[in-house]
């Protein structure tokens, strides 16, 4: 037995001594690959150039592991904050259009008043982002965004100076649309970011701020879904390619102290491919009682977004959702203020028995022309069978082609042409209920400061 044991030892030593160098190299390579697999990448290379596109990453922010610190815009530099984590900056966004409608472009949003020049948005941000790249210590941050302009009416939340819209139907107003704190915990999962306060609804390709959108106008499906939530949202990084979001809030577009507020939950997941050329982001954006309460929506929402990069020149993003709520009124949340020429759909609509539903879908197709230019083609669809979202029981489509040009890192223009129409017989939603379809040619100018 001792001789056999000695023979086995000598055989092992001999095999090691006479092993082919290529075998040793393969073993080392295998070990290196295994170590690489076990290492979580904090962030992947961004799939898109920004500028000219409004973002360099797919939908589903915040992205843990990426540096979210804002660039040093002119106001930040003027205030001597270039070397600080705190950034103070903003933008101004006037726009104009030529429309086949005379008084109102509704249900189109963010381009409401036809054949005139208007101040869509002036925004100001106070922005301090936590450091989620590191994995050593807890990090804190916050974000505050306030806007003034005609676009306030879309982000207005009941209980946040909302009488400007809900009580008066004002043309211009302001809204503190984002006010939240951030806490980053590096040791929970592969990093967890907790957001507490008022924040943008995480779903959607399109965004509330002019600076964050491919085009000047918005799709009809974006117009009628949730804009902001107030509550808490936790984002978990799970490896290199997954994130999970869990949240609780007071319902879409209302403060917790509003008498319409109801508890809603959120559960969303984000996946990207290993080359970051594909992304899927979706789940439950809002789920609760879903009871329309005290003349205000409580929208429930299932949503999914797919981003795909064909090559350096072409990419697209596609989104679809299903909305529902109970005991709603035609037209949704009630504006009790006086009718204005640009928006006459005020007062309580007729009750909708049972469940109100809506289905939306949109596709964005982008063509990179140069480092400062791109073309965006958008095709959207909205089904509003009971009129709970637009005030008219019909389905719609909207079709837009836009060209975006950056003069420099701070100034861009976004001209576009658009056609949209309703399909139900005898239904005329456009120009205050007088037309079945609408043509517009519009443009805005974004100046960052």
Predicted regions and their residues:
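Signature for the C-terminal beta-barrel architecture of outer-membrane proteins
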Residues: 52-54, 74-75, 133-137, 143, ...
